[in-house]
Design a protein with these regions (language model features):
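Short secondary-structure capping/turn micro-motifs that flank functional sites
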Residues: 35, 179, 226-227
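Short Gly/Pro-enriched turn/cap motifs at secondary-structure boundaries
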Residues: 128-133, 139-140, 185, 247-254
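A glycine-rich dinucleotide-binding beta-alpha-beta segment and adjacent secondary-structure elements
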Residues: 212-263
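Single conserved hydrophobic/aromatic residue that forms the stacking wall/gate
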Residues: 262, 266-272
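Aromatic-enriched alpha-helical interface/lid elements that frame and gate functional surfaces
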Residues: 137-213, 217, 265
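Structural signal for conserved beta-strand scaffold positions within catalytic alpha/beta enzyme cores
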Residues: 28, 103, 173-179, 219, ...
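Active-site-adjacent "lid/gating" segments in soluble enzymes
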Residues: 6-153
Length: 272
């Protein structure tokens, strides 16, 4: 991490290096693109707070950073995508270029859907915990033994399947819940009933039934529980790596390093 101007100070900026190699593709990841903010120190929290993401993530009056460093991660991804485009263009023009990715602009891209909503409708988006869902059944439920699971029924057909699957014939026949729009309007009466009934069922049972029926579901998992995820282990998405240094040097850890269909266990090295 360098302050703005550091690379120029050492003669390692694009303007200097491109004079040595005109085919150079130079990726720089910044806090802010050139403009009034470019001198500021950027952190993921900084751009999440000023870029609307923390506002949308937390409850009203309680802005909250996302549960991972989304801008650090995606800023690097945007830089890599830009480099790939520059490689294609260099194949046509024979010339390199500088690619700039920035945390703040990346964050604004992430909240772009909410900005567009306001631009089109004039209605500002509410924070996600306070939003009015487009579907009535689209929530996290606390079930047997205190476990939690996300369940959804996002169409009238899925609502019918949901009710048949769980034996909720009375809810399916209730005219108040006939269509999705009506279910959304009646959410304050419907959700307490669903929460009470679902609390008697286990997350494992609901997962199995929803999977067989093709309904959306997701048990709530902690990051450390993903090491035992059967899908991740079957696809090779988790790779064993040997730590090169530090107090745990030589030890093996598992990381999410799969690229495409090739597992990191099958490494392919290409010349630089």
């Amino acid at each position: 991490n360098f302050k703005p101007g550091t690379m120029s100070k050492y003669g390692l900026d694009y303007a200097t290096l491109s004079q040595v190699n005109g085919r150079l593709i130079y990726v720089t990841c910044k806090g802010f693109l050139p403009g009034p903010y470019e001198h500021r120190t950027a952190l993921d929290e900084v751009v999440q707070m000023m870029g609307g993401l923390a506002y949308m993530t937390g409850r009203p009056g309680d802005p909250l950073r996302a549960g991972t460093s989304v801008n650090d991660i995606m800023g690097g991804m945007f830089g890599a995508i830009g480099a790939l485009g520059a490689l294609v263009q260099r194949g046509i023009t024979g010339k390199g270029q500088e690619i700039a990715s920035a945390l703040f602009e990346n964050n604004v891209f992430l909240v772009g859907q909410h900005m567009l909503q306001y631009a089109i409708t004039g209605k500002p988006a509410s924070p996600m915990p306070d939003r009015i869902s487009a579907w009535a059944v689209y929530d996290v439920f606390t079930v047997k033994d205190g476990e939690q699971i996300f369940l959804a029924a996002v169409s009238d057909a899925q609502w019918s399947t949901f009710c048949h699957l769980l034996g909720f014939a009375d809810l399916l026949a209730d005219p108040r819940y006939a269509t999705n729009n009506e279910r959304v309007e009646q959410r304050k009466t419907l959700m307490p009933v669903l929460r009470d009934r679902l609390s008697k069922l286990s997350a494992a049972h609901l997962s199995a039934e929803f999977e067989k029926a093709g309904l959306p579901f997701a048990p709530i998992r902690k990051p450390e529980e993903l090491f035992d995820d059967e899908h991740l282990n079957a696809t090779g998405a988790l790779a064993d790596i040997t730590l090169p240094d530090g107090e745990h040097a030589g030890e093996t850890a598992r990381a999410t390093l799969q690229i495409g269909r090739a597992s990191c266990r099958e490494r392919v090295y290409h010349p630089v």
